[in-house]
Amino acid sequence: MATTHTLLSFDDLEFLLHKKDLTDLYGERCGTLNLVINPYDLFLPDDLDDDWCDDPFNCCFSDVYTSIGTEYSYIDPPDLIYEEHCATNGHWPDGTPCEPILPPFVIEGTHHYYATKPGEAVSGILSKLGSAWDPDLQSTVDTKPDFVFRAESDGPGGADIVTEEQGTVVQQQPVPAQSALTTLAAASTGKTVDCEWTTFFSYHTAVNWSTTEAQGKILFSRALSPELNPYLRHISSLYSTWSGGIDVRFTVSGSGVFGGKLAALIVPPGIEPVESPTMLQYPHVLFDARQTEPVIFTIPDIRKTLYHSMDDTDTTRLVIMVYNELINPYEQSEPKSSCSITVETRPSSDFTFSLLKPPGSLLKHGSIPSDLIPRNSRHWMGNRWWSTIDGFVVQPRVFQSNRHFDFDSTTTGWSTPYYIPIEVTLEKLDRGGQYFKVTDTEKSLVPGLPDGWPDTTIPTAMTASNGNYDYTVAEYRITNNGTHFKGFYIMGNLTTKVKGSDNLGETQQTSRTLFASVGNYKDQNTINPTHKITSNSLVVYDANNVSAATAKTTTWHSTMSHLGYVLVDESPVGSDSTKVVRIATLPEAFTNGGNFPVFFTNKIQIGHFDRAHTKCFNSQVLMTSQKLAENHYTLPPDSLLVYRITDAASSWFDLGINHDGFSYVGISTIPELDFPLTFNLHGVQLAKVKLASKVKTSKTTI
């Protein structure tokens, strides 16, 4: 390659043939800029120290030499150079050919033209102009009156380019695993994905730190896994194993006013963190609540094998706990104040995947739940009653068995998470009796128990009389509620009567109203309440069974659907655990770490009173029950999957779902919200860390 390569304007290309023809082809662009730059500066590495080359067509830097442009013979006419250049460099999206950005130039002594590829020369020149802040760069530009070229904006401002604030890197022990192990583990596939998402931090979750948190309180505890980062979680579906560490960045929202310190410690695999100051006996580092810059910690991969399987949870754990309590010196009448800690993650340099698998292949372990609740409250339906959710009720104890599922896809109930008609065979208890029992069912999750059968029992012992309502009550008044069959569910029903004689009229299908509940039969006309459901405790009453047309019928095939409820008292349906039915055990949730369990409420229509309703308590949104039943999700038993609920007035609070499927909030009372509400996944946090909120709550001053 020649000693100097000069990119020339037409004013300097006097030795070239056919100057006029080239000018006609490229127009007045040529000659307006006289910029002399050494092509070494444009196309060759900065540290190149070779000053000459005796074989330019077998260049040592073939990739660089190729990027200069397309080679043409010195004797080719200019129009051929132009046409071949356009033909070999493609077309723009609108169909026009990619014309050369600059005229052809020559490498002295080679007798060849070089027409630069589109963008190559401009990219090189702009990169040099972009370094105009370097005083060592010298360029000569012919600034004629009609020449305007700007490489900067018109407005004032500094020349510094500011990147994302990375934060302070904290060095801690133990040292991450050697990269040689990673290389060996991924030897069959090599380095996997090397993309830009490996260089920046992605949001993981947010942790609330309040002035009520005592020393030793664990605010953040997560085991090393690809689930810590959204991009790693997505790519993990393509691989079977992984290895390597993860960088975690913490940003405290404090303004320099708060006082207090947090401790970060690495817990080795096989050790379970406990909420105690004794955890501070592990090697740890401290960071202050007044820290204005982010702090970065690395969770090292400590392992005894070459790689981890995707369901491996026995890994290194990063724990953030309170070292000194948070103090707000300006706190007065407020019971507490808090700040937020934002947690972001990115893979460390040694992180890699291995053992490729097809994306559709299912692994034994579960996935991280991100779609358990619909984003808009208009799509929320209760898992006890099929109407739309319209509120929340915080309780010290929440319970439900039927249609309630946990993160292991198990339920202690007898119904699937879908509202379907109940198909059963009914038979009279006795020839002269008023009640029917269920002798067979078409659809059942538990043998003998119809799918969708109600899960509450009657309040007291009940004797059938005439099966009708007490019409002396003209309007809804709890104090004078004398209706029969309190606690029964009103069922719309289509029956086919099994004939007991040759009377064909008895086989006709009829539409009628039935009453259904759970109870133990004392005699043919009396039932007692029970909180245990069996195939012998399913009670049905037909309001019209005393008529002469149906008195002879003893067996029916019935298809029923829920229509309403016969009111008991002012208590919501499902609020009394002694009246909630279960097969054996009743799943329950209690207050935990300052977080309170919550019921989802909706309305159930009560019988006889026109357009009257009562409240019904639900342990889950129906879609949550469906997702948990159909999928195996991964959530540690000591953690909450946190969603942020925002109403139309921008008030918000965090709602966490634990491993048992119950929901929690961090406030003891939820005020009236402006519906519709929106849900957004906020991440995973420890169950004992108080959930954040920003809602208007009533306060009492003593």
UniProtKB/Swiss-Prot annotation:
Lineage: Viruses, Riboviria, Orthornavirae, Pisuviricota, Pisoniviricetes
Key words of the record: Capsid protein, Host cytoplasm, T=3 icosahedral capsid protein, Virion
Marked site (Cleavage) residue numbers: E152, S153
A GO cellular-component term linked to this record: host cell cytoplasm
Similarity comment: family membership: Belongs to the caliciviridae capsid protein family.
Its job: Capsid protein self assembles to form an icosahedral capsid with a T=3 symmetry, about 38 nm in diameter, and consisting of 180 capsid proteins. A smaller form of capsid with a diameter of 23 nm might be capsid proteins assembled as icosahedron with T=1 symmetry. The capsid encapsulates the genomic RNA and is decorated with VP2 proteins.
Protein name: Capsid protein VP1
Subunit structure, as described in the record: Homodimer. Homomultimer. Interacts with the minor capsid protein VP2. May bind to VP3 and Vpg proteins.
Record flagged with keyword Phosphoprotein: no
CDD domains: rhv_like
Pfam families registered for this protein in UniProt: Calici_coat
Keyword Iron-sulfur: no
